[in-house]
Amino acid sequence: AFAGILADADITAALAACKAEGTFKHGEFFTKIGLKGKSPADIKKVFGIIDQDKSDFVEEDELKLFLQNFSAGARALTDAETATFLKAGDSDGDGKIGVDEFAAMVKG
């Protein structure tokens, strides 16, 4: 799904680094997969993949399964990790992350 945007080796390494519950840190993950240095268009493409229901927002249930976008066998995020991830990205407080919020979070 991320061919031409992200390298498989970077994705594998990033997933390995947060394999244990409680170890997911979105900033580190975005850096490890190489997303931080990507163009706004590429970041928008990645957002479109994560936005599974195509609502133009990433909601809490989609964040919980965030890692599975990168590998079907990846774990779900814990409730605490999901809440932290949502809080970090949801700058307008509407309970979901829009594409601009996602881009701002990726750029850190």
Swiss-Prot record:
Gene Ontology CC terms, in alphabetical order: cytoplasm
Classification via InterPro entries: EF-hand-dom_pair (IPR011992), EF_Hand_1_Ca_BS (IPR018247), EF_hand_dom (IPR002048), Parvalbumin (IPR008080)
Disulphide linkage map: none
Matches recorded under Pfam families: EF-hand_7
List of residues binding Ca(2+) 2: D90, D92, D94, K96, E101
Note: Is regarded as an important allergen. On the 2D-gel the determined pI of this protein is: 4.51, its MW is: 11.35 kDa.
Homology family: Belongs to the parvalbumin family.
The protein's name in its UniProt record: Parvalbumin beta 1
Organism encoding this protein: Merluccius paradoxus
